[in-house]
Amino acid sequence: VSGGVNVMTAQYIGAKKDKDVREVVHSAAWMCALMGVILLLFGQVFSKLILEVMKTKEELIDGAALYLRIYFLGMPALGIYNFGNAVFSAVGDTKKPVYILAFSGVVNILLNLFFVIVCRLSVAGVAIASVTSQYMSAVLIMIALMKADERIRFSPKYLKLYPDKAKDLFKLGFPAGIQNAIFQFANLFVQVGVNSFDAVIVEGNSAATNADALVYDVMAAFY
């Protein structure tokens, strides 16, 4: 959905159709939050089943399921942040979302240290830190949108689903979502193979995957 937000917002701003911009922004906010709630519920119900299908080691599965269930609580916040990021990017403001994400990332690191070292919450502590930082980024980007240029400014009084705009957002965003889903689905097969090894190797692969994601995100900034 966020991909559609970026395209449609930029198009309507270029055409000087402020009413359409407002309808796109507020429809997208509603849709992204709803998608996040759906993913949250999906994660609570199917986290352990997914891990079992992926042949996760018995000694890791309880901790991994706990982590996933807590992490999925942050899906609505992730959806809202991605929505805000797309709106700001549509008007050429790519700095504000980065500053917000960087601040939330620092908070995430500090909370990781606090929950894991001080509170000794282990896996749960890492997940709680991630979710907390995600909601912080969502709140900050919504505050920024409520103070943004009038064309893209978020206002609760306009928050509703405009059917025509929602349909177009879905049509534009769905192909990009499928593309990303196919890539992630392929990675599941790789993970199933990795899970057949010892727990130490699985943990090492997780660390390598995080490093790979960092490199990919840096490259993606230039696309």
Enumerate the predicted regions with their spans.
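Alpha-helical transmembrane segments of multi-pass membrane transporters/permeases
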Residues: 32, 87-111, 124, 128-131, ...
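Small-residue-rich hydrophobic transmembrane alpha-helices
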Residues: 1-40, 78-97, 191, 205-223
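Alpha-helical transmembrane segments of multipass membrane proteins
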Residues: 41, 49, 83-87, 106-118, ...
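Hydrophobic faces of transmembrane alpha-helices in multi-pass small-molecule transporters and flippases
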Residues: 68, 72, 95-102, 140-143, ...
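Membrane-embedded alpha-helical bundles that form the substrate/pore pathway
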Residues: 1, 7, 66-82, 86, ...
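Helix-terminus/linker motif at the lipid-water interface of multi-pass membrane proteins
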Residues: 51-58, 114-121, 181-217
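Short alpha-helical transmembrane segments in multi-pass integral membrane proteins
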Residues: 9-76, 118-174
